[in-house]
Amino acid sequence: MLKDIHQHRILILDFGSQYAQLIARRVREIGVYCELMPCDIDEETIRDFNPHGIILSGGPETVTLSHTLRAPAFIFEIGCPVLGICYGMQTMAYQLGGKVNRTAKAEFGHAQLRVLNPAFLFDGIEDQVSPQGEPLLDVWMSHGDIVSELPPGFEATACTDNSPLAAMADFKRRFFGLQFHPEVTHTPQGDRILAHFVIHICQCIPNWTTKHIIEDSIRDIQEKVGKEQVIVGLSGGVDSAVTATLVHKAIGDQLVCVLVDTGLLRLNEVDEVLNVFQKHLGAKVICVDAKDRFMKALKGISDPEEKRKIAGEQFIRVFEEQAKKLNVKWLGQGTIYPDVIESAKTKTGKVHIIKTHHNVGGLPLNMELKLIEPLRELFKDEVRKLGLELGLPADLIYRHPFPGPGLAIRILGEVSAEYINILKQADAIFIEELKKSDYYHQVSQAFAVFMPLKSVGVKGDARHYGYIIALRAVKTVDFMTAQWADLPHEFLSKVSHRIVNEIKEVSRVVYDMTNKPPATIEWE
């Protein structure tokens, strides 16, 4: 019997926390579906979502100012369990009649939590035990405000040396507050605390599993598509691979895979993709040579958003042409949940677009194909689990992400055939050395960026003006935040040496040491 994987669900209201997406991933790992929405979302949307529980995220602001963000007041009146984390706890306390003040001594980093009442959230959870027999937990704090007076009906359930009210609960109304962050790995028991809230307090049944997601996706695809054919564009990335495999599992020979050779793929990528998918997928694959078409469309375009939208337009037009030849009505896309989050805007406009994703906002409004996006609700790690469950090779599943517009957005400014050729070579050298040194799977994404600037150098006995290549490598769990990868200097020196010696047009190599935020992972 098929499970309803969305039957039990948690709503996470985002107050601007860098950890908001991490909360969502933790809830998913518990086995329960959840969605992330901005904290100013309207009441109708929340009621339509019909959550079994609500989590209020942390945030960078202070509750002590009148103009800062608040939770929708009605969520405290609908009989739904609510968990406030950091800022979420503070706004809950303030809105329900408590007091919040700036603390004289902010807490950032590790703290030891003393549990005063373990009921519900902390039941059976401890890292150590105090001499008085109280459970002690190692937790991660990041706050400058504290709840100084509890709202009516609440009691203190935990404290630290600097926060007498580090956790609070109204057991009757099932409202809970945590001043620390249970979602981060620096709180070792955080997953268990969240599971207590989601499973025991909200009484959610954990149906959100890889097996059930596959079953649900197959059923959904079959119901939508019927006997019609579907085109899926292959890019060599994990998202398109899992999308194609999932669609193929659902409708078999009704799937036609299309690989568009845009001229903007990585070195030798077309041959590699054809080999992998014809061997492992067993589906029909059509390769379309569209190099001239893409170059013509991108000529004179330097704005990153325009390049993304043009790439999306050209992709769709190619698919539509193939669809007309084959009488195909549907386009399968590898849009994933972080794409949706980053491309979303609230009705109030308080959450702004970071960049337009090729799989979301880059699509033409007059697209003639109907769209299916079986991965739209999934984070990247969930997509990879699906791929492994579907039998795709691990090398493909753990391949670094590659943007839909390809090298067009790794060339700063206007794209040219010369720039593409230089970048392909530099990128291939970087990836080859990462694999040879066993660093490839230690970083989450790595690539080269072409900078259309010339810098003076010396080759032989002569001054030489050549282009600049930037190398980018990051470590991340969910691609919502990322840290630059601290690769050994000897390794970077080797890569740099190869690039400037093997690519005559390049005179300088630099390494990007910027986290996300403030930067995005891609340069454009």
Curated annotation (Swiss-Prot):
Assigned GO CC terms: cytosol
Catalysed reactions, as listed in the record: XMP + L-glutamine + ATP + H2O = GMP + L-glutamate + AMP + diphosphate + 2 H(+)
GMPS ATP-PPase domain segment(s): 208-399
Keyword Ligase belongs to the record: yes
Gene3D superfamilies on file: 3.30.300.10, 3.40.50.880, HUPs (3.40.50.620)
Top EC class for this record: ligase
Positions contributing to ATP binding: 235-241
Top-rank taxon, per record: Bacteria
Coiled coil: none
Keyword set includes Nucleotide-binding: yes
EC numbers on record: 6.3.5.2
Disulfide bonds: none
InterPro entries the UniProt entry points to: Class_I_gatase-like (IPR029062), GATASE (IPR017926), GMP_synth_C (IPR001674), GMP_synth_GATase (IPR004739), GMP_synthase (IPR022955), GMPS_ATP_PPase_dom (IPR025777), NAD/GMP_synthase (IPR022310), Rossmann-like_a/b/a_fold (IPR014729)
Pathway in which the depicted protein is active: Purine metabolism; GMP biosynthesis; GMP from XMP (L-Gln route): step 1/1
Active site: 86 (nucleophile), 181, 183
Entry keywords, A to Z: ATP-binding, Glutamine amidotransferase, GMP biosynthesis, Ligase, Nucleotide-binding, Purine biosynthesis
GO molecular function annotations of the record: ATP binding; GMP synthase activity
Span of domain Glutamine amidotransferase type-1: 9-207
One Pfam family this sequence matches: NAD_synthase
Function, as annotated: Catalyzes the synthesis of GMP from XMP.
Subunit structure comment from the entry: Homodimer.
Protein name per its UniProtKB record: GMP synthase [glutamine-hydrolyzing]
Gene that encodes the chain: guaA
